[in-house]
Amino acid sequence: MSCNGCRVLRKGCSENCILRPCIQWIESPEAQGHATVFVAKFFGRAGLMSFISAVPESQCPALFQSLLYEACGRTVNPVNGAVGLLWTGNWNVCQAAVETVLRGGSLKPIPELLNGGGFAGFPSPTSDEASEICTEMLNLRKADDSGDRNIYHHCRFSSSRSRSRSTASPPKRKRLSSEQQPSSELDLSLIPIYPIKTLPFKEDTPSMYSEESVTTVSFQNNNAGDRYVRCGGGGGGATTKLLNLFA
C-alpha cells in the first residue's frame, strides 16, 4: 500500500520507501499528506528526496521535522526563519505555523516580524534574561549600524584607491642636473659593459717571421715517392718525412 507522502506526491511507493519513516511521527494521514506537500513545495520535490536520501533511516523523522519547521518559520518570517523566531523568543509563532500546516491551512508573512529589517520580533526588556541580551544586541547593532557602514565604505574605497594607485604606472623620476644639461662629448657607447675575456698568448709558438719558422720544401723521392719537409731557418735544419695523403 502506498504511503501518504508518496500518494500526495503521486510517485511510486515500495516497501523500501524512504519517505514513509519520515512522516510516521505525524498522527493523522491527512496531516501527513499536508506536511509532505508543504515541504515539497518549499524545498522542491527533488530537493526533499535528496535531503532524505543523504541521512540514515533512523534520522529521517528528525530531518523531516526540521525541514517542516524551517519551511514554516521561513514562510512567516522570510528574513530570519525558524532560527530567528527561536532566537527572538517567538518560537510559539513557529509552532502555531506548523499546526496550521498540519490542519491544511495556508501561511503568509507576518508584518510585525518584517518591520525593522527582520529584527522587530524581539521581546521587551522586562521578559527574561535571554530576551534582554537579544534586545541589547539589537540596540547596539542599530546604534553602530551607520558608523560601521561608514567605516566599511571608507575602508572599501580606501583600499580601492590604494589598489588603483599601486596598479597605476609609477611617476616619471626627475631628471638629474647632469642629464638635463647637454653633454659636449659624444656618447657612442663604444665601451663594452662586460669585460672582454682575453686568451694568453702562447710564446712557444713560432711566428712566420721568426728564425724557428718551418720552411716547407716539397721534393719527391725518386724511389718511394714520399714527401719531406725541412724545419729550421736558413739552410740548415732537420728533414722530416711527411705522409703522402693525397697520392
Curated annotation (Swiss-Prot):
Similarity comment: family membership: Belongs to the LOB domain-containing protein family.
PANTHER family hit by this protein: LOB DOMAIN-CONTAINING PROTEIN 38 (PTHR31304:SF68)
Low complexity bias locations: 157-170
Tissue: Expressed in young shoots, roots, stems, leaves and flowers.
Biological source species: Arabidopsis thaliana (Mouse-ear cress)
Coiled coil regions, renumbered to chain: none
Gene behind this protein: LBD38
Designated name of the protein: LOB domain-containing protein 38
PROSITE patterns referenced in this protein's UniProt entry, alphabetically: LOB
Pfam family, one: LOB
Region (Disordered): 157-184
Domain of life: Eukaryota
Domain LOB intervals: 1-107
